[in-house]
Amino acid sequence: MMSEPTEKETTMTAKLDPFAVAPSLMKSWMGTSMAVASSLEASLIELVKIRASQINGCANCLNMHTKEAREKGETEQRIYLLSAWREAPYYTDRERAALGWTEALTRLSEGHAHAGAYEALKAEFTEEEQVKLTLMINVINGWNRLAVGFGLFVDPEAAKSIQAKVAA
């Protein structure tokens, strides 16, 4: 059974600490998040997490996922240029399809998911991968909303400690 995160692990200036208020739901949410994140290549997942977090203005998730991307071998150049991925020559067609789909689903309030984004997705991803990627986009958007909504800012090292407890 997962023990509760310590104060050091949740160094946040939060309006509300969901880990303290709803620990079993947060454990389940983290388990889902980890399962989805492991279902596609790590480099792609980190780009998706960063791009959605840029759109949503989530400092917590940007801090965490840019660090994780670097640790997994992502280059500074690709991280810096991610918000301008359409103009930058450093992304594969598969990454471009994933980033386009990420933007379409993250910006639903600006209109429906664009047919062009889905066509690009279909060209690069199997149907199963399309579902996995869509779930990943939903997960990171959920984390963004928790972090922004409740004012969470968790140190990336502390987040790893919490993830390890969930995995145990």
Predicted regions span which residues?
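Hydrophobic alpha-helical segments
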Residues: 1-168
